[in-house]
């Protein structure tokens, strides 16, 4: 954490910096070529996210000193967003309680103040313990933890029909118990994650998943326990501050691309198979009319600022611990293009862009937007008050 200045208002900038395993890739290279085979890479652009936030914090500090204005700037370094998260723990410890508002951004393929929020999530390891036995000679003496895991999966698959359409249940085997099929496995672990638009919906669905796990243990004569590994609140952008950031984005405009940038972006877009391109076009349909999309993809770097809709009620299906900050202080996360239109996240292509000139240009524009938005907000106490009243309507007066 970096802090400077004094007095009110207190501005928070959020940074992330974790990479993703297996996504090592040479900077700006449109052919898959890892720097280190199997190594980590910034497939979500957090190197840009963190650098942009820090640049904004330093620029705002210099502005306050030059103009002899009151105000405190706090830069929050937030690890592990791709895993268990950290912002919810920072919020729970009260570090956002005295922050008047917070701004952050995320590398994307379009330029916008995201009108849509993101969903809440909760994850846990389910641990089953049974009794080992010879699977051929004495199976009746065994109690299979692996069978319990399998039955839990069956139960959760039936549960999918009886949950809201917007909910999701994901799972992955953490420890199947062993590799010998002639052993009744006495230990097995499976990880589950549950998503839904609101925290209350996640909690309700997670309780049902736990009940399924209990049933699986009962059917197999095993014992079950679970350990919660992560939980993020849903993210809803503060509509009052979203309008401020949107205006600043329109004043500064999109990153300034060159013909070299456009050609490189087109090379990356050609790395995707036809089936993926169909999905990319569908995704971009949210931003472009059909007649606009073909023209946009001829030079596939976003050149416009897409509209901010403060009345938007839809949400993306992803999750972020920025949601927990949004329940503690008025928060806005916006997007700036750092990759070709429609580029797939968590990919080697995204790592290549994150370390390219295209990525750097997007990051610097994001830093300028955050700095200007912070200055504008600090100069308008009435806007801060309105944003905080909006927060109160959402959280009831305190971080849950």
Model region roles, listed by residue range:
Residues 1-42, 51-55, 59-71:
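Acidic/His- and Gly-rich active-site-bordering loop/insert found
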Residues 8, 56-75, 156-166, 379-384:
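Phosphate-handling active-site elements
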Residues 13, 46, 75, 90, ...:
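Divalent metal-coordination and catalytic microenvironments
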Residues 15-18, 38-52, 104-110, 131-140:
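Histidine-centered catalytic micro-motifs
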Residues 27-43, 129-133, 307-308, 347-356:
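Glycine/charged-rich beta-loop-alpha catalytic/anionic-binding loops adjacent to active sites
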Residues 48-118, 178:
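Acidic/histidine-rich catalytic neighborhood of metal-dependent amide-processing enzymes
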Residues 98-275, 281:
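Midchain, well-structured core segments that form catalytic/ion-binding scaffolds
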Residues 269-367, 386-400:
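Zn-dependent metallopeptidase/amidohydrolase metal-coordination segment
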């Amino acid at each position: 954490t970096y802090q400077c200045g004094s007095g009110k208002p207190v501005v928070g900038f959020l940074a992330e910096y974790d990479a993703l395993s297996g996504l090592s890739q040479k900077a700006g290279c449109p052919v898959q070529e890892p720097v280190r085979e199997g190594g980590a890479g910034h497939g979500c652009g957090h190197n840009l996210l963190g650098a942009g936030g820090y640049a904004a914090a330093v620029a705002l500090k210099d502005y306050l000193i030059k103009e002899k204005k009151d105000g405190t700037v706090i830069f929050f370094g937030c690890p592990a967003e791709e895993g268990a998260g950290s912002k919810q723990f920072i919020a729970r410890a009260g570090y956002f309680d005295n922050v008047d508002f917070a701004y952050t951004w995320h590398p994307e393929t379009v330029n916008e103040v995201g009108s849509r929020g993101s969903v809440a999530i909760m994850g846990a390891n389910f641990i089953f313990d049974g009794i080992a036995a010879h699977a051929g000679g004495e199976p009746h003496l065994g109690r299979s933890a692996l069978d319990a895991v399998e039955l839990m999966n069956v139960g959760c698959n039936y549960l999918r029909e009886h949950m809201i359409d917007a909910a999701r249940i994901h799972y992955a085997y953490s420890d199947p118990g062993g590799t010998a099929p002639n052993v009744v496995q006495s230990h097995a672990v499976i990880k589950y994650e549950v998503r839904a638009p609101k925290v209350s919906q996640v909690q309700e669905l997670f309780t049902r998943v736990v009940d399924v796990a209990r049933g699986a243990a009962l059917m197999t004569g095993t014992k079950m326990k679970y350990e919660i590994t992560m939980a993020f609140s849903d993210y809803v952008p503060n509509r009052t501050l979203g309008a401020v950031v949107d205006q600043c984005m329109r004043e500064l405009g999109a990153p300034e691309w060159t013909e070299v940038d456009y050609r490189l972006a087109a090379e990356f877009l050609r790395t995707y198979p036809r089936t993926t391109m169909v999905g990319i076009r569908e995704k971009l349909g949210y931003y472009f009319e059909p007649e606009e999309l073909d023209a946009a993809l001829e030079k596939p770097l976003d050149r416009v600022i897409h509209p901010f809709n403060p009345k938007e009620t839809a949400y993306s299906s992803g999750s972020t611990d920025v949601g927990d900050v949004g329940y503690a202080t008025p928060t806005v996360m916006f997007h700036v293009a750092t990759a070709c239109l429609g580029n797939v996240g968590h990919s080697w292509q995204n790592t290549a862009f994150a370390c390219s000139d295209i990525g750097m240009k997007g990051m610097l524009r994001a830093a300028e937007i955050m700095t200007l938005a912070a200055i504008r907000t600090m100069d308008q106490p009435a806007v801060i008050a309105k944003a905080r009243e909006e927060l109160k309507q959402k959280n009831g007066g305190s971080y849950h």
